[in-house]
Amino acid sequence: MSNGIVIIGSGFAARQLVKNIRKQDATIPLTLIAADSIDEYNKPDLSHVISQGQRADDLTRQTAGEFAGQFNLRLFPHTWVTDIDAEAHVVKSQNNQWQYDKLVLATGASAFVPPVPGRELMLTLNSQQEYRACETQLRDARRVLIVGGGLIGSELAMDFCRAGKAVTLIDNAASILASLMPPEVSSRLQHRLTEMGVHLLLKSQLQGLEKTDSGILATLDHQRSIEVDAVIAATGLRPETALARRAGLTINRGVCVDSYLQTSNADIYALGDCAEINGQVLPFLQPIQLSGMVLAKNLLGNNTPLKLPAMLVKIKTPELPLHLAGETQRQDLRWQINTERQGMVARGVDDADQLRAFVVSEDRMKEAFVLLKTLPV
C-alpha cells in the first residue's frame, strides 16, 4: 500500500481503528483528516459536565500531537473534506488532496434539531466543540429546557437537576425512553426524575422559541408557554452521510456497509455512528469497539466478518442507573418486572417464554452479565 489508509473523522470509532491497525502493522501509512482539533475526549462525559463543574478543555485526555506521535500517523485537523473521487482514489479539501489505497469514513452523526421557529436558539451537546461554544450560557442558566426524553435527554435532565438548575423536559411520547423500552419499565427512572424536581412535559410538543429580554420563551402546544435561559436539543442523532452520498455510495439511514464494514465501493469502508451495518445503526461504544477490531484486520488483508454478541447499553443516570440489552423496543414482549428497594430486574419474554430483552437498575445491575448470556444472538 504505497498511499496507505486515509481515515475521515477523529471520534471514538476513528481512534479505535487506528489503535487496532497499529497493533498489527507499525509502518503502513495512516492519514487522519477531521474538521475538529483531533484532541481526544470521552464523549459520554458530556452528559455530566454541568454537575461536575467541568469546562470543555477539562475533557481533553490526549492532544492531537500526542496521538500522532504515539501511533505514527499524519494528522490534518480543522480540515473539511469536500469531495471523494472514488474512481481516482482521491480525497479533497478546499486546499489539499490525499491519495488513498483504502478509505475509511468515520464521520459520526450530528444532533437533530427540531425544525421549529427559533431553532437557532437551541443548543446541542454532541461534541466537545459544541459544549465549548455554549458552556458559559449553560453554566449561567438557572432554567433549562431539554427537548427529547430519550437516553441523552434523560441523562442531561438528571445532570442539570443535580447541578441545582430548574429543569423541564419535553417529549411527544407518553413516557421517557419511549424508543428503548415500554412505560412500565421506564417508570422507575421517570419517577426518580420527578422526585428530584425535573418537570416532565410528556405528550407535549415544542412549537417555537423566541428571544426575550429575560431569557427564551418556549411556546408549547395547548396554548402553553414557559420561559427559560437555555434550550438543549436531545432529539436523536442523524448519521453524517452527505460526503458518502456525493461519492456515489449507497445510503439509507447511514452509510450502508456489509459484515466486513465495506461500502458499495470495494476500497471504501465505514464504521461508527455514520455506518449502517446490514440495516442497523448502532451508535453505542461496544459495537464500535468490535467494528474497529474487525475493520483493522480487513484493511490489512484479512476477510473477517463482524459478529456482534448480545450487548449492554448503559444509561448513565447516577441517581438511578440502568443497563439494558436485547430487543427492548419489541412490542410483542411480555414484561416480568421484579422491583425491590435496591433495584429492578425487568425481563421481556416472547410467546415461547424465551428471554428476548432485559432492563436492570441500581444494585441489580450486577445481574446483567448472567442475563446477557441467556439472550439469543
Swiss-Prot record:
Protein's UniProt keywords contain Oxidoreductase: yes
Coiled coil: none
Names of the cofactor(s): FAD
UniProt entry keywords in alphabetical sequence: Cytoplasm, FAD, Flavoprotein, NAD, Oxidoreductase
Gene Ontology CC: cytoplasm
Record-level Gene Ontology MF annotations: oxidoreductase activity, acting on iron-sulfur proteins as donors, NAD or NADP as acceptor
Biological pathway: Nitrogen metabolism; nitric oxide reduction
UniProt subcellular location: Cytoplasm
EC number: 1.18.1.-
UniProt-listed InterPro entries: FAD-bd_OxRdtase, FAD/NAD-bd_sf, FAD/NAD-binding_dom, NO_rdtase_NorW, Rbx-bd
Record's keyword annotation contains NAD: yes
Record's function text: One of at least two accessory proteins for anaerobic nitric oxide (NO) reductase. Reduces the rubredoxin moiety of NO reductase.
PANTHER family named among the record's database cross-references: NITRITE REDUCTASE [NAD(P)H] (PTHR43429:SF3), PYRIDINE NUCLEOTIDE-DISULFIDE OXIDOREDUCTASE DOMAIN-CONTAINING (PTHR43429)
UniProt-listed NCBIfam families: PRK04965.1
Name of protein: Nitric oxide reductase FlRd-NAD(+) reductase
The organism of origin for this protein: Shigella flexneri
Classification of source organism: Bacteria, Pseudomonadati, Pseudomonadota, Gammaproteobacteria, Enterobacterales
